[in-house]
Amino acid sequence: MRCVCGCIAALCNIMFVQAAEKAVPTVMRAWQLDSWTGVADTLSGIDSSYMHLPMRNRLNDYSISNISNSNLISPSQSRIYFDRQKTVDFLFADAYTPYIITPQQVKYYHTTTPYSTVAYKKGFVSNLDQNEINFSFTGNVSRRTNLGITIDYLNSYGRFANQEGKTFLGSVFGSYNGDHYSLQSSFSWNTLSNFENGGLQNVADLQGVLKPEDMPVRMQGMSAFRYLAGYLNHYYSICVERERKVNYRERDEEGNWIKKDSIKIEYVPVTTFRHIFEVNDASKRYVEKSAKQSILPNIYRNPTATNDSASCLTIKNTLAVTFEEEFNTLLHFGAMVYVMNECQRHTSAIGQTENIIHLEPFGNSYNNVISNTLHLMPDTLYGVRWTNNTYVGGTLYKHRGEHIHYGFDGNVCLLGYKLGEFQVNGHVDAGFRLGKDSMTIAAKAFFRSETPDYYLQHYLSNHYRWNNDFQKTLRLRVGGEIAYPTQWVKPKLNITFENVTKHIYFDTDGMPKQVDGSIQVLAADLQVNLTTPWVNLDNHIIYQHSSSEYLPLPTLTLYHNLYYHDCWFKALDVQIGVDMRFFTKYYAPILNPALGQFCVQDIEQVGNYPVMNVYANFYVKSLRLKLFAQYQHFNASFMNKRYFEMPGYPMAPDMFRAGLAWHFYK
């Protein structure tokens, strides 16, 4: 580790010295890559804004409302259906999505000067501190080559017993952009561990005198998750030369600016041949020191302790040919065809059984009932199964132009375990002037047939086992968005509808089930930001309706942020405000600790409680230094104590937080 830190420091020093010698202006370009085609999606660059710094964390960045165990590091699920993303093809990764950096989430950069950021945030609670450290660095080692690294470390003890979580994640990335040959490569990692407490034994303790950390909890377990990914995207473009007139300015002998022009030769790609290689390994482990005292329903393998694990290794190779949009000046669109092969290794614990001990699932009774007697092998055996899938697909797109852009893509699995799986996606957006401002309109749709995750079909652990024959899930989604930002009001409305056929969910007993029919979900997402020179009010309102109790959603989810902002003494940017999060009552699913899945329940509703934070945010311009202080959930001290993430799991009580972020660039 010391050697790695030394290499990073040396590389940073070399790049900063080179930038200082050349005295060039700071220009930065950033992009991410599409998961199927590897095509770059250009971004604006590093976000150096000081606004809303206290609210930025892994969970809030994922969705405006999430179910968790109330700790910053926790298995989680968005309460907003259309925010839920499956980024890794591994069932047990779903609950850790906010903490995963996939190759498609890695940002690549081209910078004229090196850029780095260091951030530290801390929650102050006696012996239950919360710490977050972020570091990022990127810089060009030559005109065409860029290298960078990001590192995030989070450690949060949680406010209740047996709730501590830790995660260490980051990425190392590099890119080369030549006239004909280019490549992007990355290695990303995530290691996460969190203790499981099953919620409070008695929720009435919230109304008593016990401190949160002294309230009895229902179990003692631990979960660990690891994700590693390597990625290489490289391509060669056949180009034609094109002359372009370039206007520029330079000083004459007397120091006056004069306008000049010249002819620049640029390379326009005609056809691009691309190869993408990706390998990732995801694994999940669940441990209990005493299986007999677990709140989980059965014991299949070891009556004294639980040590379950499952993993999925995925290797992908993609070959693609692109007919570039830049060269197609007649029809003004680009096209791509590709073939992708995916090889997966599924490894899980399998064993033989002896005592099947039934415990009341998620109940308060720990009385064991022997329901069956079978033979037990005390050791854990491991079963390995390889699967292979081959896809063909294509895209048609128009990214250039001022007014209308579109993209259509699709693929189908022709061979392998996922035979017959397919997806068709499309989007169109248009922008035009309306009065003094610009309006944008967009529409999206997809139709997908999805093969159930391997571990939804086959799984064996100390508490659960199943062999299912689920059918493919069909999903049809259509949606539209309209935005019309003006000087004082910035409204944006998104309406989305989805029909899900053969939806798979986890039932109250922790077993996966498939709905024999269709479920409809409708959501209206309205954002209205009111701005004045000094006071802003940001509003985010989401309405959701689900036609089935097997897909529970809150009807309304709200986020409001009222704040004052100004510049003091022409040197200090200031933001002072209060924000609130709220969702209406509903039958929230409850976390199953052994599976890391959220199971439906119809016993208790949670919601109708606002979580309010007050904060102050500062930016010292001359130092490029951001500072903040926040009193989180301050209303917990004077409102009723019926605040729950899900049944049995209270929200975190009030806490004081502070932090800083420092940017370094020439």
PLM features: what roles do these ranges have?
Residues A19-L228, S237-R251, K264, D429-M439, ...:
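Membrane-proximal, glycine/serine-rich, low-complexity loop/turn segments characteristic
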